[in-house]
Amino acid sequence: MNDSVMRHTDSTHPIVVTFNVGSATIKMAAYDTAQAVDSSPLAWSPLFDVNINLKTKNKVWHAMPQSLADWEPQDTLTDTAVSLFTRVRQAFPAREIVCIHRVVHGGKRYHVPVVINETVMAHLVELSPICPLHQPPALSVVNALQGMDKKLVHIAAFDTAFHYHRPEIWSSYALPKSLRDQGVRCYGFHGLSYQAIMRKLETYLPKIAKKRLIIAHLGSGCSITAVENGKSKDSTFGFSGLDGVPMGTRPGHLDSGVILYMVEQGWTLEQMNQCL
């Protein structure tokens, strides 16, 4: 039995579909758990890249199902995610599918991947005001896929998890306890990116991975994190995705007096959100 046929008939291992939903982009990958953990994805596509290639470990799988070959992006992130997922399911009709979602904020409650149920979803929705550009789109995709098939398993992996175990002195603000009890603290983000970098270092440069490191995540959103022995020690991000270095549309670190000044000048909350 050739490799392409095995992919369509092996029902003992699920296909894992991952979604990385940002404020204006979406990346999807599909992995066959029957392969090695570090094997290439079966399918991968960022938004507007319609050249999805199905891959074996090192070679492009040329017998690409037509359901993926003729895929085109949709008008919204959610519709695009649903369209991509539908095509993957059509390509592997006999396989169980598990969805894993990058979720930016897990708050103080979630620091390991969790299965998304009603309780988990409710808590993640509560965190949306802290990450208004990223949390709602990701949760919208989860809701849309759940609407397609109630039996699908959805797992959330959190950007904040990498920074969760930092010492309290690095994560606390000098604010009233009542605010700290509400979850006002330094969280740190881009954690999944930092975890991926650390895994590569541990594989290819294990001696370097154990040292004190400064790692930068540079894109539309940017952050810098100090790592020691593979663990986050400090990060330029704080309570939200606004702090730290200047970014594509965010000013980065601001003296809190600037916010007070803007309020005194009559800026509305909506105007400040748009500006910052």
Predicted regions and their residues:
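Gly/Ser/Thr-rich active-site cleft segment
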Residues: 101, 132-197
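N-terminal phosphate-binding loop and adjacent alpha-helix
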Residues: 36-94, 115, 120-134
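Gly/Thr-rich phosphate-binding beta-strand-loop-beta motif of the actin/hexokinase/Hsp70
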Residues: 10-59, 211-233
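Short beta-strand-loop/turn "lid" adjacent to the catalytic site in phosphate-handling enzymes
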Residues: 88-135, 153-155, 161-173
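Glycine-rich phosphate-binding loop of actin/hexokinase-like ATP-binding domains
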Residues: 165-264
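Conserved active-site and cofactor/substrate-binding residues in soluble primary-metabolism enzymes
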Residues: 23, 75-79, 115, 119, ...
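Beta-strand segments within the central parallel beta-sheet cores of soluble alpha/beta enzyme folds
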Residues: 212-216, 270-276
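A glycine- and small-aliphatic-rich helix-loop capping segment at beta-alpha/alpha-beta transitions
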Residues: 31-38, 112-122, 169-178, 229-234
